[in-house]
UniProtKB/Swiss-Prot annotation:
Coiled coil: none
Gene giving rise to this polypeptide: glgC
Tagged with keyword Nucleotide-binding: yes
Catalytic activity annotation: alpha-D-glucose 1-phosphate + ATP + H(+) = ADP-alpha-D-glucose + diphosphate
Name of the protein described by the UniProt record: Glucose-1-phosphate adenylyltransferase
Keyword vocabulary terms for this entry: ATP-binding, Carbohydrate metabolism, Glycogen biosynthesis, Glycogen metabolism, Nucleotide-binding, Nucleotidyltransferase, Transferase
CDD domains reported for this sequence: ADP_Glucose_PP, LbH_G1P_AT_C
Family, similarity comment: Belongs to the bacterial/plant glucose-1-phosphate adenylyltransferase family.
UniProt keyword Nucleotidyltransferase, yes or no: yes
Pathway participation: Glycan biosynthesis; glycogen biosynthesis
Length: 380
């Protein structure tokens, strides 16, 4: 099967900085914005950009992620000219081996990529929130004759030392790469989005692992090698909204930004939809005792308490006398009577008993998936 460009999403990360929220699932499967999961944004970007054949490389706790993606029907990837393939670590003649890094994950799946026979390979992270046209990036890649194009975004100078920084010339050619430099020379941060000419990348990876010169990571190994070897490496400047939601603070802030009617993601844009797989649920019920202000409430929820500036995912229940402010309530969570929740993230299926106070004023409070807090007496 010949593809001009194959999309490969790296979705195997543990997401340890998200703590309890990734205890039993990979970071790309974490719910976001009421009715989505983080990986939905990357998958939807692929589909909207015309990239209809996608491999999703998983590793850590893949069950929820695999179930969410399924056969790709929610993204229109279930027909003869499209498809999504889940790629997990497997045993070969050399035995089983976990992916050691981003580039190693690609190397371990060369068989799948060769079967798809792409001219270009688009390598993506499955744990960022953004909307991006990869076709425009491919157009630039072709125009410049690049061997590798790296998507970059300008970050605040005081945050640049937290990223891989690309230093470019006047033609946007990358001349130097620094991984989390103490004194950055530019603020062009790598987004972890790459377009490679597949034939050349394949050659580099095979030669490297055959000679035990393991290039396990794109940022630490492959990009520096390309630059040192004189390959044509260009930056693609991205100007839109992009969030790395790898920490509790960043995940909470990104969700709160979602409540702004003028947020940069603009999910009302019918020309660039974000698709997801959502359970069929009845309409939400707003009880007579409920008070709701500046909130997002998804289907299947029952609200009898007060909700202010918060996101409530599908099938959430909030009983009478409870007050939820500045918080994210993930799918299936149940909150009892006279509960106070402020600046918190409540995990999927969590149960909060009556009269509990969860206060994240000093630090965002987190209740894990299926965690039970307090004594429950309300109806399930």
């Amino acid at each position: 099967m010949k593809n001009e460009m194959l999309g490969v999403i790296l979705a195997g990360g543990k997401g340890t900085r998200l703590g309890k929220l990734t205890h039993n699932q990979a970071k790309p499967a974490v719910p976001f914005g009421g009715r989505y999961r983080i990986i939905d944004f990357t998958l939807s970007n692929c589909v909207n950009s015309g990239v209809k054949n996608i491999g999703v490389i998983t590793q850590y706790q893949p069950l929820n992620l695999n179930a969410h993606i399924g056969n790709g029907a929610s993204w229109g990837l279930d027909d003869l000219n499209a498809g999504v393939t889940i790629l997990q670590p497997y045993s070969n003649n050399e035995g089983s081996k976990w992916f050691e890094g981003t580039a190693h994950a690609i190397y371990q799946n060369i068989g799948y990529i060769d079967q798809m026979d792409p001219e270009y390979i688009l390598i993506l992270s499955g744990d960022h929130i953004y909307k991006m046209d990869y076709e425009a990036m491919l157009d630039q890649h072709k125009e410049t004759g690049a061997s590798l194009t790296v998507a970059v975004i300008d970050v605040p100078w005081d945050e640049a030392s937290r990223f891989g920084i690309m230093n470019t010339d006047d033609n946007n050619r990358i001349i130097d790469f620094e991984e989390k430099p103490a004194e950055p020379k530019s603020n062009h941060a790598s987004m972890g989005i790459y377009i490679f000419n597949w034939k050349r990348l394949r050659e580099v990876l095979v030669n490297s692992f055959t000679r035990n010169q393991d290039m396990v990571d794109f940022g630490k190994n492959v990009i520096p090698y390309y630059l040192k070897s004189g390959e044509s490496v260009f930056a693609y400047n991205f100007k839109g909204y992009w969030k790395d939601v790898g920490t509790i603070d960043s995940l909470w802030h990104a969700n709160m930004e979602f409540l702004d009617e003028n947020n940069e993601l603009n999910l009302q844009d019918r020309t660039w939809r974000i698709y997801s797989r959502n359970p069929i649920a009845p309409p939400q019920i707003i009880a007579e005792t409920a008070e709701i202000k500046d909130a997002m409430i998804v289907d299947g929820s029952y609200i009898a308490g007060k909700v202010d500036h918060s996101i409530l995912s599908a099938n959430v229940r909030i009983q009478t006398g409870s007050v939820v402010t500045d918080s994210v309530i993930m799918p299936g969570a149940k909150i009892g009577k006279n509960v106070t929740i402020h600046r918190a993230i409540i995990g999927e299926g969590a149960v909060i008993g009556d009269d509990v106070v969860i206060d994240g004023t000093d630090e965002i409070a987190v209740i894990g998936n299926k965690e039970v807090v307090g004594v429950t007496s309300h109806e399930e």
